[in-house]
């Protein structure tokens, strides 16, 4: 496995996403400039300039025409993917931590941190016709994580048919919200640490969560029933499900502030492949000299990308031996 090294960010990567076809990778980092790359050869196509703080999240719509980012400069921005121009900016009360387009692309959601006297809030906005007036438009729906929840949203997904939103929280809980009634449908507390990341399977029936409690867990995306647990010795920052095999890839490592040795050989910063059903680790891939902050599978399942605290995005393309591998 000879990786592609995508070098362009000056600071730690916060999130990476493939578009639906998998020909583009979008990456955000703590350096104010979300970037877009060709996934085939690692060429950087451009940056999206406009944020004034660390960019925490990114998502691209189904047609790869629009991009949404949320940042520490207390704003969420919508971009034209092709030209890099800002379509609209939404001011927030605190840092925007998560942002996602719905499957239809008609709506988008973003959440803000619990900070400066404001509770963590979740917003649903209409993004069919975005222009500069979106900064003053009221959201379609606003959910406040009030006294009963009192924990900030750290990751978020859209549920089936754009009817629900799934949120992962700082206290390890995962909740499903009905967007019609603005009420909580279900919640589980299987994790004991902050939920760093959640990603859906290709068909949307399952989701994998990555937590600081050193485990990743597989849930039914409708009932939130915990199906499988993948155990490691270190915090898991990101996890993704293969679209073609029954495999899960996990990435993490020590927290950035606890890292003392940054040797790639120490084995602390590998991405780890687990069997989806048997919960057993069967491979590790070295490379980063710092924790892995974000992972994403290519939609064709033949490669995956990792973004690390070292500021690099690495694209790992699987060898022939990966496809011939039989789990015993």
From Swiss-Prot:
WD repeat windows: 8-47, 50-91, 148-187, 190-229, 287-328
SUPFAM superfamilies in the record, alphabetically? WD40 repeat-like
Q: Name one GO molecular function term.
A: translation initiation factor activity
Asked whether the keyword Repeat is assigned, the reply is: yes
GO terms under biological process: formation of cytoplasmic translation initiation complex
Where can this protein be found? Cytoplasm
On the tree of life, the source organism's domain of life is Eukaryota
Q: Which InterPro entries match?
A: eIF3i, WD40/YVTN_repeat-like_dom_sf, WD40_repeat_CS, WD40_repeat_dom_sf, WD40_rpt
**Any single Gene Ontology cellular-component annotation:** eukaryotic 48S preinitiation complex
Q: Per UniProt, which keywords does this protein have?
A: Cytoplasm, Initiation factor, Protein biosynthesis, Repeat, WD repeat
Q: What does this protein do?
A: Component of the eukaryotic translation initiation factor 3 (eIF-3) complex, which is involved in protein synthesis of a specialized repertoire of mRNAs and, together with other initiation factors, stimulates binding of mRNA and methionyl-tRNAi to the 40S ribosome. The eIF-3 complex specifically targets and initiates translation of a subset of mRNAs involved in cell proliferation.
Binding partners and assembly: Component of the eukaryotic translation initiation factor 3 (eIF-3) complex.
Q: Which PANTHER family does the annotation name?
A: EUKARYOTIC TRANSLATION INITIATION FACTOR 3 SUBUNIT I (PTHR19877:SF1)
The family this protein is said to belong to: Belongs to the eIF-3 subunit I family.
Q: Per its record, how is this protein called by name?
A: Eukaryotic translation initiation factor 3 subunit I
> Per the UniProt entry, what species is this protein from, by scientific name?
Culex quinquefasciatus
């Amino acid at each position: 496995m000879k990786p592609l090294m995508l070098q362009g960010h000056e600071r730690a990567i916060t999130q990476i996403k493939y578009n639906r076809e998998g020909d583009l990778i979008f990456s955000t980092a703590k350096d104010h400039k979300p970037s877009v790359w060709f996934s085939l050869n690692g060429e950087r196509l451009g940056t999206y300039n406009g944020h004034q703080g660390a960019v925490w999240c990114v998502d691209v719509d189904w047609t790869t025409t629009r991009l949404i980012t949320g940042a520490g400069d207390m704003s969420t921005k919508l971009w034209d993917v092709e030209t890099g121009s800002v379509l609209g900016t939404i001011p927030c009360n605190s840092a925007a931590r998560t942002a996602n387009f719905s499957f239809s692309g008609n709506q988008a959601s973003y959440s803000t941190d619990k900070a400066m006297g404001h509770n963590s809030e979740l917003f649903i906005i209409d993004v069919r016709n975005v222009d500069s007036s979106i900064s003053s438009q009221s959201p379609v729906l606003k959910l406040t994580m009030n006294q009963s929840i009192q924990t900030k949203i750290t990751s978020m997904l859209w549920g089936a048919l754009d009817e629900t939103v799934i949120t992962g929280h700082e206290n390890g809980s995962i909740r499903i919200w009905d967007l019609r009634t603005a009420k909580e449908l279900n919640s589980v507390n299987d994790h004991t640490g902050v939920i760093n990341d959640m990603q859906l399977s290709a068909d949307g029936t399952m989701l994998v969560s990555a937590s600081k409690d050193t485990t990743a867990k597989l849930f039914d995306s409708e009932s939130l029933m915990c199906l499988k647990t993948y155990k490691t010795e270190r915090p898991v920052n990101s996890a993704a499900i293969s679209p073609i095999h029954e495999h899960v890839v996990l990435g993490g490592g020590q927290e950035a502030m606890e890292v003392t040795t940054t040797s790639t050989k120490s084995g602390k910063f590998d991405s780890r492949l687990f069997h989806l059903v048997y919960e057993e680790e069967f491979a590790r891939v070295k490379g980063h000299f710092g924790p892995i902050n974000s992972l994403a599978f290519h939609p064709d399942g033949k490669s995956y990308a990792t973004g690390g605290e070292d500021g690099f995005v690495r694209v790992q393309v699987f060898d022939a031996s990966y496809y011939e591998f039989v789990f015993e």
